Amino acid sequence: MRLPTARNLTQKASLNALAAALDYGARLVVGFLVTPLLVRGLGETLYGVWLVLGRATEYLTVATGRSTQALKWTLARQQHSTEVIAKRRAVGSALAVWLLFFPLVITVGSVVVWFLPTALHLPPGLIVITRIAAAILLIRLIANSLAEVPRSILEGENLGYKRMGLSAAVTIAGGGLTVLALHLETGLLGVAIASLITVLITGLLFLSVVRVNVPWSGVVKPTSDQTRKFLSLSWWFLLWRFVMMLMLASDLLILGFLESVELVTTYSLTKYFPEVLVQIVAAVVFGITPGLGGIIGSGDLKKAAMVRGEIMMLSWLIFTILGSGILLCNREFVRLWVGADHYAGALPTLLILLLMIQLILIRNDANIIDLTLVLPRKVLAGLGGALGAVVIAAILVGHFGAGIVGMVLGLLAGRAVLSFVYPIMVGRFLGTPMRSQIRAALRPALLSSGLFALTASLGVWIQLEPDVGFGAWLRLLFLFAATVGMAGLVSFTVGLSQEQRHSIAHRLSGLANSFSKRL
């Protein structure tokens, strides 16, 4: 059996980015509507517990072996290959590694389920409920690790766009299940069960999409040598997952263990709007990256360097434009959304935004390094930076009582080394010296700093009418749109060269054409 060879990487990248954007748009809308209901339905304490449980169980994904990541990037490099058996054996290897790690997941998960509630210093009446909810989330984790197999096949084959609209619909349905659980007053347990059902539906969806759209889909028993090779590769992806968990989930755990779950609630609600940046950029970048894998696999490093430049340029444009609007409007957004008492302040908002931007840039280069399948240096550097960040943040919060500001400063300082190490690693592989990277980033960085300083200052004293009705939301939306529009105009005309502006216009044109053809 021979497979058709994929040709138009730009079109697929555009469609993948669009599909990811639709998914994120659904998650954004669902989160925006459901979060206030969760805060009111669970209360400030249990909502904080729910957030910490979610972050803690995310750490357990490390124990699953992360074989699906190895599968995704292996297929990304082989997407032009017509060897069916080799691809099916890759799937078999991923499942074999998953089975090897299953006992570890159960063992470590059981320990977390039992001891986490007491570590949060919860009242005795909440201990049992929290343990049961944690157990449900452990089952969700196991189900999700299996659901990642068909998802990784789609993304590795650069066919993520084939689920366009379907996964967004499942996200909306999952939000509906959460609202139903709150309406029925099932509390923390009902919300946990709703999230489990959503994961099960998502897994079945991706499996059906793979069967329809991937001609070679199937599993072949791998050889012992292939399994060992996959296990070796998965080991580094596993460690990298741990690094990412330290970057993505350590903030809530530090505040939850060293401060209080109530402060976790305030921090997470203040962070909600800035965190949009990470997800939007991830939606764009993750849609482009598998296509970049095909370019790297073909040996065209010059073109790969050009695509990497586009990724960084688009990331900068997005976080500068939206970040300006967020700094100006976040205080009013939190006030209208969940109440002014849940706003952490202007300085924490600015620092959180900078933390999100730092994470975006680190993840961009980390994803490119993944495509080389040469992971040890990346993982070890990331582990050192992430652990250092957690230690510094924990000291500032636990010993000095610096709260949210101290925690974010600690994370920024600890991860700063990765902001230099990863670009150097990528530059060596693609032939882009660090000096030229710094030179290219200087003008955009200065422009972003100026816009952020201006909008953060204005955001301190700008206040809309004190009402919280629909009219207030419209005024806030107008203010945000006007800010984003002005920041976009300045960023596009001042921050980009003529060649970069042409490149973005070409990318947007390709996206529009791809979408119109799909319709």
What are these regions (language model features)?
Residues 14, 141-166, 189, 353-387, ...:
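Membrane-interface junctions at transmembrane-helix termini in multi-pass inner-membrane proteins
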Residues 1-31, 85-96, 127-130, 206-210, ...:
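N-terminal membrane topogenesis motif
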Residues 37-46, 161, 172-204, 376, ...:
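Membrane-interface helix-loop junctions in multi-pass transport and translocation proteins
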Residues 9, 13, 96-249, 457:
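Hydrophobic transmembrane helix module of multi-pass membrane transport proteins
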Residues 65-81, 155-156, 214-216, 275-316, ...:
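Helix-loop junctions and terminal segments of transmembrane helices
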Residues 15-32, 170, 194-206, 210, ...:
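Transmembrane helical elements of multi-pass membrane transporters/channels
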Residues 1-7, 424-438, 453-519:
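Membrane-proximal transmembrane or re-entrant/amphipathic helices at the cytosolic face
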Residues 1-13, 206-249, 253, 287, ...:
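Interhelical loop/hinge segments that connect adjacent transmembrane helices in multipass membrane
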